[in-house]
Amino acid sequence: MRSMAQHLVTKIVTRRGLLMSKGMCPRMGRLCAVSIFCAFSGIQDASCVSEPAPPQDLERNHPGVAARYLQEGRWQEALSQAEQGVASAPQIADFLFIAARASYALQQPRARALQWMARAVAKDMQWCVYDIEEVRLFYARLCVDTLQHARALELLATAEQVSADADWLRARARYGLGQVEHAQELIEKALERWALDARFAKLFFAQERSRRPSSRSKKIADSILSRLSVWQEQDPSLLVEAALFEPRTNMAFRYLQTYFTLRPLDAPGESSAQSSYEQSTRAGDSAPEQELYARAQSIVLGLQYGVLDEQRAMEMFCTLNSPLAVPAVDPTDDVSSFGVHASSVSSSTPLQRVVVLYADLLHEFSRLLASRPIRARFARFLAEFEGVLYTDENRDGIVSARVFFKAGRPSRAQFDTNQDGILEYEVYANDGAPTCVHTMHSTQKTELSRASVFPIPQNIAAHDHERAAERWIAPRVSLPADNGVEGETQARVPLTQQGYRVCYDRYPEVHQVGWEDKTYVLRPRALRWQPVRMQSLDLARDLEGVRSHDFFTMVLTNEPLPTEQQITVSSLYYEKPDSLFERARVRTYLDEGLPLFSETHVGSRFRARTHYVDGRATRRDSDRDDDGFFETREYYNAQGAVRALSVDVHKDRSFAYQEEYGAKGQKVQKWYGRGRVTISHTELPTGHARTEWLHPVTGRHVTVDFVQGVPKRLLVDGEVHALTKDPRNAALYWVRRIPRNGDEVGQRIVESFRAATSPVVSEYFRTGGSVVRAVRSGGVVFAEELEPGKE
């Protein structure tokens, strides 16, 4: 019943023609869809159907509008609408699913789509439109694309419906896990069950191309070749793959001729660069990089079988290009996401048509060139190559490495080893020698939650996964921060985690490492780290007889990242921001990983210096007012907290003020004059405080006790004096009594002390024949009317 409701909702909400043909406005159609869904599903209080809400809230909180945009291929509008829906109705899973599919279609990083989906399949989420089988297939597709083949099989193991999509994903996952026989078995059955679907034939050709043929694989290849005409118009690139498996030269020649007829050389299928998820999953359509590879391979095979002459093949091979986002990136900046095709970049990102070569085709092409002049031209082309070299090691159509060239040498390399769209490594080079490496880490490893809409599969074979029950559940991940939604039970995992920024003196000798907010500068030759190595393609041997330089690329070495301890021990110093001053940076010098001293600069101005003993900060001198004199000194305890602070107020190299901090929270402030303490103020954690000073005129010892900031007792040379609070001035207290003209003299006292800056100030006031002596201590003023003759 629920499936029927979802089907009706989808038809009403996502098909504009049905709405308009009935004379119904889109808004009414959406409300009608909500009503039908409620009636069939029995949901009365679902959050996607708020009964008391006005029509505009129903429209905003129901995913119908976003679903319609998705159905019509309006990816950006669907994504924007879905993000708004997530913000207003975070419990509705359809918005998350639509956002994931739209971002995938826009060729944004797959890691983002995985995050959307991880939240969508949580147990507490509610579905309004989409069938769970469709959700399962898309999630499995994401897992296969990002090399999570085990998880994909676990998701598909509980599928309730039989479909070509599910079988295709299973076959891909089996190949990814190295289970070739199981994959061949699936393809063999699928060729009969889904006879019109070209994806299985294409998958078989791509994965079996470099394997030694078995009797079973030969049988499958013959079966595919015998029915090639069924699929050739759906996916002409299948003809190129077939030529590699065709034992008859004349038939291979015919396949290539047919391909060039369907895909003319002068129109290399640029429109395919805009293909989306929905198009690429149907038989006959290819993702942009798959289509580009088929074009490059057709040129090589065309030369091999005589369909193209050397001149024509050379021109086509050396001008094959693709629209790529190639922003001018500073090597010291953070790494951006993996460069992708034009449809995935914003309007502000510059696009360039970049010449593309494939590493596995270069050997074959250069070997086939027989003419000496053509070989010489190709050698010059490689020596001056300005473009990008693609690598797809697992032949799944997703590029895992891109190496950009300038003047025939690598200038930048990008590695996305798990194919989630977030770079693990980006390498910058000068004339082929690495100068800087950025490392980033994707969020494939996340905390797993067992709350999911998909039940735990009970019947997964042992050869599939030994720990399926522990690993199958999708991670519960919060949405990206810019979407404004984060549930209380969600584990917050950012899209990317910041890694290292490593720069070299001479590769692989590390000169500088940036990590979090720190920048480490290493001692010469103290640390070597070689994440990539130069690999020659040996093209000079293929181009024998002409002058050619060694054409090489970059490949990962899988050398582990250096640890923080290794970096620290190898460092001369490190720098980081200093919160003491605006735009300040502190440089800490190290000896075998332990701090010796540190200096703080604001631009070229030297503002502070910290001394260390056995790696522990003991003292810091600083110039707080930027006059060139270090007037402030801080002392630190064993835990690194400030235990005392002294200030040379008069800049005479004697400290006039000091603060001391006790282990139990007490604080003591002292002011000095002529080498002795003139004022002392002690605060206790209980709220009690005491101020003591020598009267600046009489020299008598004065003590004031405070409770919660209020003066409670005043002693002068041990004699207790009563205190009376002035009714008009909260900070004024009278000793013993308030004089008759207290209002007038009290106002004069407050105004007089308002401009004073000294901690303790004493003044005499004459008014109405009487004399008043007033003393300010901190923020409190004590006033006393003197007897005649005692002033």
UniProtKB/Swiss-Prot annotation:
InterPro entries: TPR-like_helical_dom_sf. Residues 267-288 are annotated as: Disordered. It comes from the Bacteria. Residues 271-283 have a biased composition (Polar residues). This is Uncharacterized protein TP_0374. It comes from Treponema pallidum (strain Nichols).
